[in-house]
Design a protein with these regions (language model features):
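Adenosine-cofactor binding site in Rossmann-like domains, unifying the SAM/SAH pocket
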Residues: 23-44
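Mid/C-terminal beta-alpha module of Rossmann-like enzyme folds, strongest
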Residues: 15, 190-191, 197-241, 273, ...
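Catalytic helix-loop patch of NAD(P)-dependent Rossmann-fold dehydrogenases
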Residues: 75, 79-83, 103-145, 150
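N-terminal Rossmann NAD(P)H-binding glycine-rich loop of SDR-like oxidoreductase domains
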Residues: 1-22
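Glycine-rich Rossmann NAD(P)(H)-binding loop
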Residues: 173-178, 203-210, 257
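NAD(P)H-binding glycine-rich loop region in Rossmannoid oxidoreductase-like domains
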Residues: 39-76, 89
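C-terminal amphipathic/interface module of NAD(P)-dependent oxidoreductases
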Residues: 243-277
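NAD(P)-dependent short-chain dehydrogenase/reductase
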Residues: 133-179, 185-186
Length: 277
């Protein structure tokens, strides 16, 4: 299978490249190589490559920056997937588009499944939902894959907190928001198997537990035997410009039907911690 991978400089893309079997032909394209917001460039680049599938990992993901840079957020997160969908259809390729839990408003008391109605509350969430809608509208051979709170694969908030705790300083995690902490490698390992099913549609690939970042750091404290405390943070105490859903946890009903559900959080955290050593 020939795969074209957009957003190749990102964490998910780098992780996916590390797990795809060598007999597949993968063409990674960074933003410098392919600006998905440029329709003509997308067509000129993708169609001659004759891909079997396009995996879109290119996005503007800085939630607060999206509030300040709305035009760029919609260009990257809505128009970009639109252009990719048109190009994928033109060359007969499937399109796997990675989206987010932030398409939901957080008012549900239990995890969101694939049939729940999105209602985003931030520019980031609205722009990502727009991208989903463009993909569904313009190419029938599509996968929309929503993920949870991604960690691992490189420097991120969680790895910085763990480094702080290992140095003897207390960690700090947001307490009044919950989601689905999701190890990036566990998602990356399931993208190609999902593509190969050709069972197109919308899927949730997210960790199975509902936790806050405070809960996650507390688990890490015990798993790693760290003799430090974890401090609770509240949204109101942080300089966050974009609203966050109170609950953005996902449940993976359709992925479970395919045997692609993710491992428990403790398994993910042990793998994550092993990679930090």
């Amino acid at each position: 299978m020939r795969l074209v991978l957009t957003g190749a400089e990102g964490t998910m893309a780098r992780t996916l490249l590390s797990v795809v079997p060598a007999h597949h032909d993968v063409v990674p394209l960074s933003r410098a190589e392919l600006d998905i917001g440029d329709h003509h460039r997308v067509m000129r680049t993708l169609v001659p490559l004759h891909p079997d599938a396009v995996v879109n990992l290119a996005a503007m993901t800085r939630v607060d920056d999206c509030e300040d840079e709305r035009d760029e957020a919609y260009r990257s997160n809505t128009l970009g997937p639109h252009h990719l969908a048109l190009a994928a259809r033109a060359c007969g390729a499937a399109l796997l588009h990675v989206s987010t839990d932030y398409v939901f408003d957080g008012m549900k008391e239990s995890p969101y499944d694939e049939l729940d109605r999105p209602n985003p509350i931030s520019v980031y969430g609205r722009s990502k939902l727009g991208g989903e809608e463009m993909v569904r509208r313009h190419t029938p051979e599509h996968f929309v894959v929503r993920t949870g709170w991604i960690f691992g694969g490189g420097p991120d908030h969680l790895s910085r907190q763990v480094a702080l705790m290992r140095s003897g300083e207390p960690g700090a995690g947001l307490f009044d928001r919950v989601g689905s902490p999701t190890y990036v490698r566990h998602v990356a390992e399931r993208l190609l198997p999902l593509l190969l099913t050709e069972r197109f549609g919308t899927y949730h690939l997210a960790g199975p537990e509902v936790e806050s970042w405070f809960d996650v750091l507390t688990r890490i404290r015990f798993l790693a035997g760290l003799p430090v405390m974890v401090e609770r943070q509240l949204v109101q105490d942080l300089d966050l410009r974009a609203p966050r859903p109170v609950n953005s946890a996902l449940t993976s009903l359709f992925a479970a039907d395919l045997g692609l559900e993710l491992p428990p959080l403790d398994v993910a955290l042990k793998e994550f911690l092993d990679g930090q050593d």
